[in-house]
């Protein structure tokens, strides 16, 4: 088995830097589009055989060191009682705005309400047969609450920010419920066979460090502390968190995901030797000529300076119009340039 990814999560030495890409199963791959053309996005997420097929594609095509479950962060929110659609982009018909709205939300039973996610994990563990580890994932409570309150995507998330200050009791009740749901969902993924968990806090960085510490940190910390993760590393990725790494670190977890706005070496200096890191190439670099991609890969590796506990990744998801051969080249460069 290729254990480089898991070893790096635990800060152990590896023979070369492991690499995978956020959104590595996605629209930039013709093979993904061939599957996606036959069904809607939600149907793809809810059909274990198809979700497993697209999860495996980048392992075979790119040669990455980990597979990540194909799903969506909002999958477990729908059975809380919110109708979800993609038109495109996620839309909830009835956003959560009042205490009555929060009280109507239920905590789903993952085995009963999202069995397709757990079945996908079981299929993947069998299909991967130890080739590379399988990462499960979920959205952080704050990012999930952003969509639930706004009802759709937003540039500034003003509605949930207003709730924090104007209706703090509603915000706290919602975050408590979402955190409980998240904990049940991620623990079910671990029971089903996920070998690592990534928590995506895509919108955590829209808050000031003070607001993050007050309104977000307690819930993410509670979530991470509530995971049954003796042998399952947890990666915590907060996009835009470069100005508050030490605060985000207080949430716990084993690996800090970094976006491209921070120098990886300086981030490691701040976080200390006991926190592994993942990142952090700007996704747009994959539009560059191959020799430029190689230079940029080397720069990120040089910033890490050979320290154990580095997983190479993009600073956010791969973009849908990136040429697949450039992603393949990036993976090859990481492996070749980091070979011990």
From Swiss-Prot:
One of its GO terms (molecular function) is uroporphyrinogen decarboxylase activity. Its main location: cytoplasm. Substrate binds at residues 23-27, 72, 147, 202, 316. It catalyses: uroporphyrinogen III + 4 H(+) = coproporphyrinogen III + 4 CO2. It is found in: Cytoplasm. Pathway: Porphyrin-containing compound metabolism; protoporphyrin-IX biosynthesis; coproporphyrinogen-III from 5-aminolevulinate: step 4/4. The record marks 72 as: Transition state stabilizer. Keywords: Cytoplasm, Decarboxylase, Lyase, Porphyrin biosynthesis. The keyword rRNA-binding does not apply. NCBIfam families: hemE. It comes from Geobacter metallireducens (strain ATCC 53774 / DSM 7210 / GS-15). Homodimer. It comes from the Bacteria. One of its GO terms (cellular component) is cytosol. PANTHER family: METHYLTETRAHYDROFOLATE:HOMOCYSTEINE METHYLTRANSFERASE RELATED, UROPORPHYRINOGEN DECARBOXYLASE. Belongs to the uroporphyrinogen decarboxylase family. Catalyzes the decarboxylation of four acetate groups of uroporphyrinogen-III to yield coproporphyrinogen-III. One of its GO terms (biological process) is protoporphyrinogen IX biosynthetic process from glutamate. Its EC number is 4.1.1.37. This is Uroporphyrinogen decarboxylase.
């Amino acid at each position: 088995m290729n254990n480089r990814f898991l070893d790096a999560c635990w800060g152990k030495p590896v023979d070369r830097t492991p690499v995978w890409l956020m959104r590595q199963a996605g629209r930039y791959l013709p093979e993904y589009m061939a599957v996606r053309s036959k069904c809607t996005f939600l149907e793809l997420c809810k059909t274990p055989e198809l979700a497993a097929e697209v999860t495996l594609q980048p392992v075979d095509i790119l040669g990455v060191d980990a597979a990540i479950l194909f799903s969506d962060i909002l999958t477990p929110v729908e059975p809380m009682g919110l109708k979800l659609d993609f038109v495109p982009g996620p839309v909830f018909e009835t956003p959560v705005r009042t205490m009555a709205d929060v009280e109507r939300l239920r905590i789903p039973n993952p085995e009963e309400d999202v069995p397709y996610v757990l079945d996908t994990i079981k299929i993947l563990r069998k299909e991967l047969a130890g080739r590379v580890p399988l990462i499960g994932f979920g959205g952080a409570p704050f990012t999930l609450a952003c969509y639930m309150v706004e009802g759709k995507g937003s540039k500034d998330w003003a509605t949930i920010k207003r709730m924090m200050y104007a209706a703090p009791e509603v915000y706290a009740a919602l975050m408590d419920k979402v955190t409980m749901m998240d904990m049940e969902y991620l623990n079910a993924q671990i029971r089903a066979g996920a070998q690592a968990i990534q928590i995506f806090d895509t919108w955590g960085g829209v808050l000031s460090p003070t607001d993050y510490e007050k309104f977000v940190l307690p819930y993410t910390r509670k979530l991470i502390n509530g995971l049954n993760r003796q042998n399952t590393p947890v990666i915590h990725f907060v996009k835009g968190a470069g100005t508050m790494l030490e605060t985000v670190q207080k949430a716990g977890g084993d690996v800090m995901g970094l976006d491209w706005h921070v120098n990886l070496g300086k981030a490691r200096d701040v976080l200390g030797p006991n926190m592994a890191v993942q990142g952090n190439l700007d996704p747009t670099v994959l539009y560059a000529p191959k020799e430029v991609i190689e230079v940029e890969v080397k720069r990120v590796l040089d910033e890490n300076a050979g320290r154990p506990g580095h997983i190479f990744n993009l600073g956010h998801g791969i973009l849908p119009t990136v040429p697949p051969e450039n992603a393949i080249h990036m993976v090859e460069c990481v492996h070749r340039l980091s070979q011990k």
